[in-house]
Amino acid sequence: MSTPIIVMGAGGRMGSTICRLVQEEPQLCLAAVLERPDRASGVARDGCIAGSDPDVVFPQVPGGVIIDFTAPEASMATARAAARHGNAVVIGTTGFNEEQKAELAELARQIRLFWAPNMSVGVNVLLKVLPELVRLLGEKYDLEMVELHHNRKKDSPSGTALRLAECLAEARDWNLPDVACYHREGIIGERPQKEIGVQTIRGGDVVGVHTVYCLGPGERIEVTHQAHSRETFAQGALRAAAWLATQKPGKLYNMADIF
């Protein structure tokens, strides 16, 4: 039996990509699409429910898995509505503050809830191998990162960059807020050894590029992940949705739980 999928923001770039790919997966079916009231009629598709109110649509798809790549406040509203109606949720939105992350963790005790700032296979493999690389190199190597995205991205640094920076900090038993440097200007003196630089570039239509630099005496290692298409993230979300449908509530799941 196929898993019914509910797509939030179905008229957006990610939402429309997800809708298209769901229809190509035999184990999934597109059950409902949601958009803002002024755009809801434009996302209607044959054989699935279209609307704008989660409290109206979600109860019509019992057992449905919601996929949301919208914006922090909208995704929080989605998660709360899912908790009211018992639906599972896959969230790929970035830019959550600490209070919102804590609320997601609390909601995950009631419903099946999955959140990952980046759902590409490559990035999540990178998160697995980076700690070992950092440990092997030792603390004489400075750690820096540059992330590049399209000019319409609203949050900075990207959620992926922050997760990669957390990964680097954890490998050295550092607390990221204590060592992160997001801006350098003027006479700032020598670079502290206990620091992780995270720099941001915005422009054009770049889907996403993240480069981690390990800079040591006489050499450097650069590790780069480039996303060439939003399908990378959409495919990861579909994989997460199919997996989440078989899980139970109790924790805030992420890509590490799948790999």
Swiss-Prot record:
<feature type="active site" description="Proton donor">
    <location>
        <position position="153"/>
    </location>
</feature>
<dbReference type="InterPro" id="IPR000846">
    <property type="entry name" value="DapB_N"/>
</dbReference>
<feature type="binding site">
    <location>
        <begin position="9"/>
        <end position="14"/>
    </location>
    <ligand>
        <name>NAD(+)</name>
    </ligand>
</feature>
<dbReference type="GO" id="GO:0050661">
    <property type="term" value="F:NADP binding"/>
</dbReference>
<comment type="pathway">
    <text>Amino-acid biosynthesis; L-lysine biosynthesis via DAP pathway; (S)-tetrahydrodipicolinate from L-aspartate: step 4/4.</text>
</comment>
<feature type="binding site">
    <location>
        <position position="150"/>
    </location>
    <ligand>
        <name>(S)-2,3,4,5-tetrahydrodipicolinate</name>
    </ligand>
</feature>
<dbReference type="InterPro" id="IPR036291">
    <property type="entry name" value="NAD(P)-bd_dom_sf"/>
</dbReference>
<keyword id="KW-0457">Lysine biosynthesis</keyword>
<keyword id="KW-0521">NADP</keyword>
<dbReference type="GO" id="GO:0009089">
    <property type="term" value="P:lysine biosynthetic process via diaminopimelate"/>
</dbReference>
<feature type="binding site">
    <location>
        <position position="36"/>
    </location>
    <ligand>
        <name>NADP(+)</name>
    </ligand>
</feature>
<feature type="binding site">
    <location>
        <begin position="159"/>
        <end position="160"/>
    </location>
    <ligand>
        <name>(S)-2,3,4,5-tetrahydrodipicolinate</name>
    </ligand>
</feature>
<keyword id="KW-0028">Amino-acid biosynthesis</keyword>
<feature type="binding site">
    <location>
        <begin position="92"/>
        <end position="94"/>
    </location>
    <ligand>
        <name>NAD(+)</name>
    </ligand>
</feature>
<dbReference type="GO" id="GO:0016726">
    <property type="term" value="F:oxidoreductase activity, acting on CH or CH2 groups, NAD or NADP as acceptor"/>
</dbReference>
<dbReference type="Pfam" id="PF05173">
    <property type="entry name" value="DapB_C"/>
</dbReference>
<comment type="function">
    <text>Catalyzes the conversion of 4-hydroxy-tetrahydrodipicolinate (HTPA) to tetrahydrodipicolinate.</text>
</comment>
<dbReference type="GO" id="GO:0019877">
    <property type="term" value="P:diaminopimelate biosynthetic process"/>
</dbReference>
<dbReference type="GO" id="GO:0005737">
    <property type="term" value="C:cytoplasm"/>
</dbReference>
<dbReference type="InterPro" id="IPR022663">
    <property type="entry name" value="DapB_C"/>
</dbReference>
<comment type="similarity">
    <text>Belongs to the DapB family.</text>
</comment>
<keyword id="KW-0220">Diaminopimelate biosynthesis</keyword>
<dbReference type="GO" id="GO:0008839">
    <property type="term" value="F:4-hydroxy-tetrahydrodipicolinate reductase"/>
</dbReference>
<dbReference type="GO" id="GO:0051287">
    <property type="term" value="F:NAD binding"/>
</dbReference>
<dbReference type="Pfam" id="PF01113">
    <property type="entry name" value="DapB_N"/>
</dbReference>
<keyword id="KW-0963">Cytoplasm</keyword>
<feature type="active site" description="Proton donor/acceptor">
    <location>
        <position position="149"/>
    </location>
</feature>
<feature type="binding site">
    <location>
        <begin position="116"/>
        <end position="119"/>
    </location>
    <ligand>
        <name>NAD(+)</name>
    </ligand>
</feature>
<keyword id="KW-0520">NAD</keyword>
<dbReference type="InterPro" id="IPR023940">
    <property type="entry name" value="DHDPR_bac"/>
</dbReference>
<feature type="binding site">
    <location>
        <position position="35"/>
    </location>
    <ligand>
        <name>NAD(+)</name>
    </ligand>
</feature>
<protein>
    <recommendedName>
        <fullName>4-hydroxy-tetrahydrodipicolinate reductase</fullName>
        <ecNumber>1.17.1.8</ecNumber>
    </recommendedName>
</protein>
<keyword id="KW-0560">Oxidoreductase</keyword>
